[in-house]
Amino acid sequence: MTGDLNEFVAHFWPVRVVFGAGSTERIPAEVKRLGARRALVLCTPDQRDLAQRVLGDLGDLGAGFHDGAVMHVPEASVTRAAQAARDADADLLVAVGGGSTIGLAKALALHHGMRFVALPTTYAGSEMTPIWGLTADGAKRTGRDPRVLPSTVLYDPHHLTSLPPEVTGPSGMNAIAHAVESMYAPDRNPITMLLAEESIRAMAQGLPVAVDSPGDLDARTRTLYAAWLAGTVLGMVSMGLHHKLCHVLGGRFNLPHAPMHAVLLPHVAAFNEVAAPAELGRVAAALGAPGPGGAGAALHALLRFTCTERSLAAIGMPAQGIYDAAEHALADAYANPRQASREDIARLLRAAFTGEMPA
């Protein structure tokens, strides 16, 4: 599979998308359209104010809110949320937040058959994918199942204007990671590659502005559009070494999700450039840095401009965990254009640990 027009398979997921400033106001109408009686609003503790606003807008359709969403979706958090939904007699969820909250809604959809509406407040993109994740006993399991897709996604850039720079930068880099890995996925096709390039281009243009001027609505709209595209392609193709490493590090060391993606991405891109020069050349061009070997360096430059934490050490990775992580990364098969040994992965992680320029 080369990503050309000769032969490919494309699968598009049936998710309704409502995009634009002020789209939050349409949540009650979407809940009614789905025929729900009582909607429970999910969030993390720091999104409680927005969740309460959404609950107020729902009026008689609101069943309360549950603020127990946790990073990496621990099993215990799913059990608590399921009980909250039963206690509230809810037949629909409204997930307000980023990947943690949407991940919780996905787990409830998968294991308890609950439908949900998503209002993303970061660039994570999880809302557009059939990918779920669950953490138990220090390991994060992931899978794909169309049952975890939301019925409706509402993208409202107003909610990102309050996202601080230290969250905006890593979250945007996380979205770029989805698009970059889709460029060399074995099941890519011309449509996914076009969507990925447009996503990278839009995020690279808008993210520095959003970090520098968080209230710039045009920049927030552009970057949210980029995140939507990135999540869309993430849901259509398989991911490679980058996402595998993030699942391992997140599950074993509970590292913050978006900063982990941001730090690792330049190093994985540089590692893969020798095996996917054409695809990563297109990534470099979308980043505004055309030329051979440019993707890893351009991503590292964007990381340094938009993120304050630029190494695994800075986000809490223990140095002694490098070889353990490398070993676990080899435990399960994953698609990647370049085969990696344990020493290859350990070398990559050491460079990411110190934050040095990717080789």
Swiss-Prot record:
Mechanisms controlling activity: Inhibited by p-chloromercuribenzoate and by 3-oxoadipate, and, in a temperature-dependent manner, by manganese.
Entry annotated with the keyword DNA-binding: no
Gene: tfdFII
Subunit structure and binding partners: Homodimer.
InterPro entries: ADH_Fe/GldA, ADH_Fe_C, Alcohol_dehydrogenase_Fe, MAR
Record-given protein name: Maleylacetate reductase 2
UniProt pathway annotation: Aromatic compound metabolism; 3-chlorocatechol degradation
Family under the similarity heading: Belongs to the iron-containing alcohol dehydrogenase family.
